[in-house]
């Protein structure tokens, strides 16, 4: 899908938004209706000194997961991302700058984008997958239980103080489609 998505200069990418996600943004309620927005896009935009109107526009836009994306080599999306990355790196932190730059390219610059389904870039820390015992593969936890193509371990998958990204021996309990529990690693293995 990534190759097809980037046809004609479009960006092929996945948003971090889907069925079963319980929290999209953090908000600190001060009193009454007054709150401080703590969404990833807004927080990074403010620290990167992005114009307040643009930061507000990004505040509740679905965050874009840049762990995997596709762009043709001559796509105008590259210039937009480069321009925005220079801006975010100038005043912000290195961590998150590339993601913020891509979010600005999509939601502010309006580059042509093909949004791909979550199973193309599944963030396991947001929602654990299920395991299909018949197909021996991870699937989305909700019907129709599409097969997961890429498992993204952003934010880590932890067992005590051990992170699965760093320790190949870490396994977690995962529900199966038959309602069993299996101890599995979410890491790719041949």
Question: Locations of the language-model features?
Answer:
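Glycosyltransferase catalytic domains, chiefly GT-A lineage
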Residues: 1-190
């Amino acid at each position: 899908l990534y190759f097809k998505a980037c046809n004609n200069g479009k960006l092929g990418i996945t948003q971090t938004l889907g069925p079963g996600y319980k929290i999209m943004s953090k908000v600190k309620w001060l009193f009454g209706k007054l709150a401080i927005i703590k969404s990833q896009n807004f927080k990074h935009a403010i620290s990167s000194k992005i114009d307040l109107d643009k930061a507000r526009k990004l505040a509740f836009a679905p965050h874009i997961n840049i762990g995997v994306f596709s762009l043709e080599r001559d796509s105008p999306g590259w210039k937009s991302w480069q321009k925005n990355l220079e801006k975010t790196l100038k005043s912000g932190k290195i961590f998150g700058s590339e993601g913020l730059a891509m979010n600005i390219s999509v939601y502010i610059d309006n580059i042509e984008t093909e949004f791909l389904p979550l199973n193309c870039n599944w963030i396991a820390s947001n929602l654990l997958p299920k395991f299909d015992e018949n197909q021996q593969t991870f699937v989305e936890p909700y019907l129709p239980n599409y097969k997961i193509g890429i498992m993204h371990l952003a934010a880590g998958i932890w067992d005590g103080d051990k992170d699965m990204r760093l320790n190949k021996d870490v396994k977690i309990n995962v529900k199966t489609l038959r309602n069993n529990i299996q101890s599995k690693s979410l890491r790719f293995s041949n």
